[in-house]
Amino acid sequence: MEQLPIIEAVGLGKEFVVHKRAGRIRRTTTKVMAVDSLDLLIYPGESVGFIGPNGAGKSTTIKMITGVLTPSAGTIRVLGIDPLKERMTLTRRIGVVFGQRSQLWWDLPLADSFGLLRHLFRVSESDHKESMDWLVGLLDLSTFLQTPVRQLSLGQRMRGELAAALAHRPELLILDEPTIGLDLVSKDAVRTALRQLNETYGTTVLLTTHDLADIAEVCGRVVVINHGIIVEDGPLPTLISRLGSERIVMVELTETLDPLRIAGTIHMRTEGRRQWLRINETETTAGAVIAAIGQQTSILDLSLSEPDFDDVVRRVYGATS
């Protein structure tokens, strides 16, 4: 039986009217297409990174997916329903975490916030206890469950936000900048939780972030949006392999030499007997470069770096700006 998509957007568009003052009295209006003819299918169990530069259309798309904004064009269905017409029904089936907004009660202990959310989402006491027992262990919440939310550190609060979004066992989890401002330990805890959630329970994850390490550690698929249009969509390794056409080789030679000149490479720097070369793999291969160096001189040691995900994404942004 064919799987139905969790998110199905067809020709999705959102147009905003921007008013600008022209002189003391007159105003001019400009129409801005924030999202333009976007087609997106996300299937159950996928963990998808949704990335793009500021103003690319990420937040607008997320707001249409969650029923906050009305599309100007196209159709959107989430879990088989219209998010705008059946927003309350959708709310009980998805979890949402926005790094800059809270769904917790600031004056209440964290545990009390979870209890209130149980009633709002109409979760049975037994199901809630089972979920919370797992989440408390996964996110290491036990030491601050009785602490008022306003007294929590940013990292503690974000772990609490993630638990709050997951306590009702959503089929789809949407996260917008969940690790913004967090220390390394808290970031690692959030990423580990998202991986385990996806792998253990098959929860579909849609993650937007500017921290590309989040994408690299959590997501198997990347969708890149720019100027409201999807410019890349595919498995993360494929994206890196296809667009990461440059690698860096470091060679340590038996003697100090002038910069090596090898076809298909650019000499980056020399430090004593070590030299770094950037390899353009559209022109040559790492094996051919190493063989060419070996014909010129003796090699003591070498290392070869894989394409950097940050560089790949910057290349995508630059090509579509």
Model-derived segments and spans:
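Conserved ABC ATPase signature
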Residues: 107, 148-152
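Conserved ABC ATPase "signature" region
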Residues: 115, 119, 127-144
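Hydrophobic anchor residue at the start of the ABC signature
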Residues: 162
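Conserved catalytic motifs of ABC-family nucleotide-binding domains
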Residues: 169
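Catalytic Walker B motif of ABC-type/P-loop ATPase nucleotide-binding domains
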Residues: 173-177
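ABC transporter nucleotide-binding domain
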Residues: 191-280
